[in-house]
A protein has these predicted regions:
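A short, hydrophobic C-terminal helix/tail in secreted or cell-surface proteins
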Residues: 342-347
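Transmembrane helical cores of multi-pass ion-transport proteins
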Residues: 1-341
């Protein structure tokens, strides 16, 4: 029963987090929800970890978003919708190759502090990208100078209602996390944001909301593998696959040591490959192990991969029956939920 409850809470909290990371990867927000169904269920089937959770996460999303920028492809465009699944497919191919080469043992030679520094850098980049959204503008892109320039430009035309809503949301999240860490404040705040959009003139105040999402499941199709030059695909997909392997295996082994069990590193690579393959076939960005979601499952005393299966099945039901609320979610609230998720993954 605890696994079921933990799975449903993970699903609910994953809604804003996954949507935010999907946008960072250059996809419409709903693709974050698509990536929270079949990929995590398939990972649960193949994984030897009883508790680790797969999902749309910071590092792969940021790397894919950066790659799109380097290719001159606008995030959210039709071209991005075609290119991202191609990159995800080749990430899955690399992860399968790592499995066949028994490359899981290589993670023992990766410095945890170096990997931690790399992830911290990605999280900081994501935070800087999202600051303009807190001020009422659009997300930033590019390197540090471009990000800072966009923040300053947005600050010149700041929308104070957006900023106030964001700061209040962030203060509530951080306070509740400190005094009542088990309380699912992210879920409550998301619901409260939707209610505020209904009862208050958010649009008149200049507070942006997410685009409405029609109910339904993702379309399954094989990506157009000839869409990009092979050398470009190999470079981007290999870097993402290495990050997924290193970050997720290091985190999985940390949880395993903490809780007194062992995982099969090579079998985990097969699970990563399977999850990313189905992500590619449903148009999603690469999927990664999530420290924040796993810690949440542990916090609610989840013990088995039933958590992942329940989370994925619950998200499937939501996509079929209940996506109407998404168009009422205020962007500043979503941004703050993303900030706290970044902090959890960095920690």
């Amino acid at each position: 029963m605890r696994d079921v409850i933990a799975g449903m809470i993970i699903m609910a909290v994953s809604i804003p987090i996954s949507m935010g990371y999907a946008q960072i990867a250059g996809l419409p927000a709903v693709y974050g929800l698509y990536g929270s169904v079949f990929p995590i269920i398939l990972f649960a089937v193949f994984s030897t970890s009883p508790q680790f959770i797969f999902g749309v996460d910071a590092a792969p999303a940021a790397l894919i978003g950066s790659a799109l920028l380097g290719m001159g492809i606008e995030g959210g465009s039709k071209e991005a919708l075609e290119v991202v699944p191609v990159l995800t497919f080749f990430v899955a191919v690399w992860l399968l190759a790592f499995y066949l080469m028994h490359a899981g043992k290589l993670v023992n030679y990766i410095s945890a502090p170096v990997m931690g520094g790399f992830i911290s850098g990605i999280c900081m980049t994501i935070i800087l990208m999202q600051v303009p959204k807190l001020l009422g503008g659009t997300a930033g892109t590019g390197e540090l100078p471009e990000l800072l320039e966009h923040i300053l430009e947005t600050a010149g035309r700041i929308n104070f209602p957006s900023l106030m809503l964001g700061l209040i949301s962030l203060a509530i999240l951080l306070t509740v996390k400190k005094v009542a860490p088990k309380f699912p404040m992210a879920v409550v705040l998301m619901a409260a944001g939707a209610v505020l959009t209904v009862v208050l003139p958010m649009e008149e105040w200049g507070i942006r909301t997410l685009e409405a999402v029609k109910p339904g499941l993702p379309q399954w199709k094989i990506p157009d593998l000839a869409l990009l030059p092979l050398n470009q695909v190999i470079t981007v997909s290999l870097s993402v696959a290495v990050v997924i392997m290193a970050e997720t295996l290091l985190a999985e082994n940390n949880f395993a040591q903490k809780n007194g069990y062992r995982i099969n590193d090579d079998q985990e690579l097969l699970a990563f490959a399977a999850g990313n393959l189905v992500a590619a076939l449903t148009g999603c960005c690469p999927i990664n192990g999530s420290v924040s979601r796993t810690a949440m499952g542990e916090q609610y005393q989840g013990k088995t991969q039933l958590m992942s299966i329940v989370a994925g099945a619950s998200m499937l039901i939501l996509l079929v029956c209940g996506t109407g609320f998404i168009g009422y979610l205020p962007v500043p609230v979503l941004t703050c939920l993303l900030y706290t998720s970044d902090a959890a993954d960095e920690g």
